[in-house]
Amino acid sequence: MFILWYSASSTFGKDSDIVMGVRAQQKEKTRRSLVEAAFSQLSAERSFASLSLREVAREAGIAPTSFYRHFRDVDELGLTMVDESGLMLRQLMRQARQRIAKGGSVIRTSVSTFMEFIGNNPNAFRLLLRERSGTSAAFRAAVAREIQHFIAELADYLELENHMPRAFTEAQAEAMVTIVFSAGAEALDVGVEQRRQLEERLVLQLRMISKGAYYWYRREQEKTAIIPGNVKDE
């Protein structure tokens, strides 16, 4: 009898685990639907601040009251979107660096990948741009954190590839990211030919920064090898 009871309880436990697993999957699916619904409603004319909970819930196919099972409020949804946008971009750039390792121009491959991201995920980039200087301190901090992650990863790569001190690679990475985001803002709502021209201009600008960083580093190295006072600062 004990064996029968143990067997039955064991089966019940497994069934319960399966049910819990299905519920967790369904909850994650609904949460995903809410995030995608919010992204789909952003546009050149519409910012995140103008979205309403009811609109997002309706687009996701759930009742407005069910929204709170997944997010405390609309702001938490927005912060999740910022995190996802930054992570998406960083993952794509990591993939670009993997392609570079197999051969190809570092800067051109990176720029092409970035422009692909904007073309495929315009609203994700719009969110980062707008909330970077928005009215919410929490959103500004979240975007700044994502950009800093992006700069840090690029600085790591430059340090490894160019064998320059961290101070140089961080300055170079910050300059590059600033220019890239500026070009991205221009590329959001232009045609194919204009985007191609922007891409070429961005490649040139990044190459100039890269060359400038390298020669500045060489100059600093040469200065340390010469007696102080013998080199005129430019």
UniProtKB/Swiss-Prot annotation:
Activity regulation field: Has been suggested to require either an unsaturated acyl carrier protein or unsaturated acyl-CoA (but not their saturated equivalents) for DNA-binding. Another group suggests that unsaturated thioesters are not essential but act instead to enhance DNA-binding.
Domain HTH tetR-type residues, every copy: 29-89
Keyword tRNA processing: no
Subcellular compartments: Cytoplasm
SUPFAM superfamilies per the UniProt record, alphabetical: Homeodomain-like
Major site of localization recorded for this protein: cytoplasm
PROSITE patterns assigned to the protein according to its UniProt record, in alphabetical order: HTH_TETR_2 (PS50977)
Keyword presence, Ribonucleoprotein: no
Any GO BP: negative regulation of DNA-templated transcription
UniProt KW keywords: Cytoplasm, DNA-binding, Fatty acid biosynthesis, Fatty acid metabolism, Lipid biosynthesis, Lipid metabolism, Repressor, Transcription, Transcription regulation
Quaternary assembly: Homodimer.
Name of protein: HTH-type transcriptional repressor FabR
Organism field: Escherichia coli (strain K12)
Gene: fabR
